[in-house]
Structures are given as C-alpha cells and as structure tokens.
Amino acid sequence: MPIQIEVCIDNLESLHNAINGGADRIELCSSLALGGLTPSFGFMKKAAAISSVPVYAMIRPRQGDFLYDNDDISAMIEDIHAAKLAGLQGVVFGVLKANGDIDMPLSTRLMKIANDNDLGVTFHRAVDQCSNYKKAIENIAELGCERILTSGLAANAYDGMTVLNDMVKLANGRFKILAGAGVTAENAKEIIEKTGVTEIHLSGKSTRPSKMKLMLDGVKMGAGDLDDFIVPVTDSKKIDAVRQNIK
C-alpha cells in the first residue's frame, strides 16, 4: 500500500508548495506555531478551489488544552458546517474530558455533524494527552474516525515509535494511524518501517524573507520573539525529499 503524505499548512503559499512537493492530503490550519487552529472560511474556500488533493480543516477554536466549554463547541459545530460549505473533504478535531478521557458525548455529536455533511474525520493529537491511549483507541473506533493523528504520546513521532507500533496493532485495520510531529526526510522511512503506519504527517517547514521594501523596527504584531519580516512556509523540496526517501 502506498504511503500517504499529509502536509499541514497555514497559508496559501504553503498550499501550492505542498501540492507541488507531492502531498496526498492537506491539513488546513491557522497558526501552526500554536499547534494549528481553525482556518478562516475564506481560507477554506480558496484552498478548496486551488487544491488537487483532499483538504481537511482543523477544528480547534483556541490554543491550549482540549477541554472545551459550550461556546467553544458551538463554534466548532459552525466551523464543521463551514468546511462543508467551503467545499472541503474533511475535518480534524479532538475533545477531552477533564480527566484525560475522550469526551464521547461531545465527540459523538461532532462526528454526527461531520457525517451528515459527508466529511471525513481525523481525530487529532488530543489523543497524545489522553489518560489511556489503549482505551482511546477503542473510543475512536466506536466513533468511526478515519484516522488518528499522533506522535505516539511522545514529543515527536521518532521518539514515539514503540507506542505508534502498538497503536497500529490495536487499531487492527479499523482506522489509520497517522504519524506526525518531527517527521523529516531523514527519519520518515525508519518511522514507517518500525511502526507499520501507512500515513505520515509533516509541515516541511521553512521560512522566506518578507518582500516588503520598508521594514520598520520596534513595532511588533505579536510576540516579541517573532520576526514580522520572516514568513513561515512549506518547502516543496522537503516534501518531495520525504516522498523520494520512502519509496
């Protein structure tokens, strides 16, 4: 079975680069520096018009944990509908209870809305903060998700290979395990061979300098350690290098 490469992006320039590099699927986000948040409707709609591969929108209304209140859930529901209206193929979400278990009532509610809109569903890395990943595997199978995006409960997929391999065995073909976090051309093949995953997730991140001619110092648009004149983008060569190295 060919290995599927999913690329997470948070701007349209990166979308073009990811597709040119050979991405099989796109995870559409805003704010990748925060772990990925829900993209705007305009971004979703434009991505759907441009992309030649399936696009799944991140449904995450804020940074931080995955314990959401009623307002958050209402926003997530609206965003799932927006993903369908924009013409996307799927959504990505994860909802936990305070004790670290998957919130099954809320997850079931979100799944129904996605299913009613003919959207595929990836359960995201909230699973890496679950109290018991083996229980989470069964919960996600019950929900009917297509896949789990996970690092194997580690800081990166390479360090999580043992758990990733166990997850593949526990999933037993009921859904895919999508290995993500720190996946590169240098380690992708080893991760695949040692875990048995058939899908990998990466950003292929790089940066480019701003094309602005006027660059004023002293006025920051965000955190002080961020350079407003350096633009994070996906590097198509990094995506292609992964594809070539896993052949």
Swiss-Prot record:
Keyword Oxidoreductase attached: no
Pfam families: CutC (PF03932)
Keyword annotations of the record: Cytoplasm
Cellular localisation: Cytoplasm
SUPFAM superfamilies: CutC-like (SSF110395)
InterPro entries named among the record's database cross-references: CutC-like, CutC-like_dom_sf
Domain of life: Bacteria
GO molecular function, one term: copper ion binding
GO cellular component: cytoplasm
Family the UniProt entry places it in: Belongs to the CutC family.
Name used for this protein in its record: PF03932 family protein CutC
Gene it is expressed from: cutC
